[in-house]
Amino acid sequence: MVLEVKNLSFKYSQKLILDKLSFSVPKNSITSILAPNGSGKTTLLKCLLGLLKPLEETEIKACNKDILPLKPYEKAKLIAYIPQVEYYAFNFSVLDFVLMGKATHLNLFAMPKAKHIKEATSVLERLDLESLKDQGINDLSGGQRQMVLLARSLLQRTPLLLLDEPTSALDLKNQALFFDAIKDEMKKRELSVLVNIHDPNLVARHSTHVVMLKDKKLFLQASTPIAMTSHNLSALYDTPLEAIWHDDKLVVYAL
C-alpha cells in the first residue's frame, strides 16, 4: 500500500469532524473519496498533509514511512497536492510556478537547470498549456490554474498525489485531459492518487477504488464496481438513487 491510515480523528475546537478513519490506497490506483457535503473530505486531505494536526492515536504511513513527524520538504518528496483553486501572493509566471515542482530535487538555493526547464516545458505541452508559460499564475482562469497545478505536481514526481475537487473549475474537455494525463503518468511510473470528488459519475469513470465517508466515520471502502451501487449510494446520501452501469460507465440519478 502506498498510503495507510489508521484511527484518524480530528476536532475543530471541541467538535469531532473525523472519527477513527482507517483506510488504504493501493499502488498504481486512483482512489476517490465520496461523501455528502460537510463530511470533512478537505479536512481529511489536510490532515494527511500535516496542514491540520489529527488526534494523537492517528497513524499515517506513506510508502511505509510515518509521515506525521516528517518535515515539509520530506513530505514533499512523497506527496504532491492540488488544492481547490487558489489565488497566490506572488504572480509567478506559469513556467516558474511549474518549475517549483522540482524544488525537492535541487539543493538549497540551486537554480533549475536546462534539463529541468525542458522537462517543465514538455509537461506544459502535454497539457496544452505551452502558450500560457509566460503569463502570471493569477492572470489565468480557475480552470487554467488547476491544469497548471497538475503540471507542477507531475514534475514533482512523487509516488502519491492528493487532489481536492480538481475538476470543479474545468470544462468537460479539460476534465478528460486532466485525468488522461494522470493515467498516462501512471503507465510510465508508480503513481497512486487519492482524490476528493463530489460527482459519482466522475468517480465511476476514473477511479479504481472508492472510500465513502458518512457521519464522521468510514462508511465503505471497496473497488469501484463493488462500491458504486444503487444500494450503497442511496445509503450514503440518504436519498433514493439509481446507479446503472453500461459499457463500464455509470449513470446515477435520483428516483
Swiss-Prot record:
Keywords: ATP-binding, Cell inner membrane, Cell membrane, Ion transport, Iron, Iron transport, Membrane, Nucleotide-binding, Transport. The keyword Lipid metabolism does not apply. InterPro entries: AAA+_ATPase, ABC_transporter-like_ATP-bd, ABC_transporter-like_CS, Metal_Ion_Import_ABC, P-loop_NTPase. GO terms for cellular component: plasma membrane. GO terms for biological process: iron ion transport. It holds the Pfam family ABC_tran. Residues 3-240 form the ABC transporter domain. Gene3D superfamilies: P-loop containing nucleotide triphosphate hydrolases (3.40.50.300). PROSITE patterns: ABC_TRANSPORTER_1 (PS00211), ABC_TRANSPORTER_2 (PS50893). One of its GO terms (molecular function) is ATP binding. It is a peripheral membrane protein. Its main location: membrane. ATP binds at A35, P36, N37, G38, S39, G40, K41, T42. It is found in: Cell inner membrane. It comes from the Bacteria. Part of a binding-protein-dependent transport system for an iron chelatin. Probably responsible for energy coupling to the transport system (Potential). Belongs to the ABC transporter superfamily. This is Probable iron chelatin transport ATP-binding protein jhp_0821.
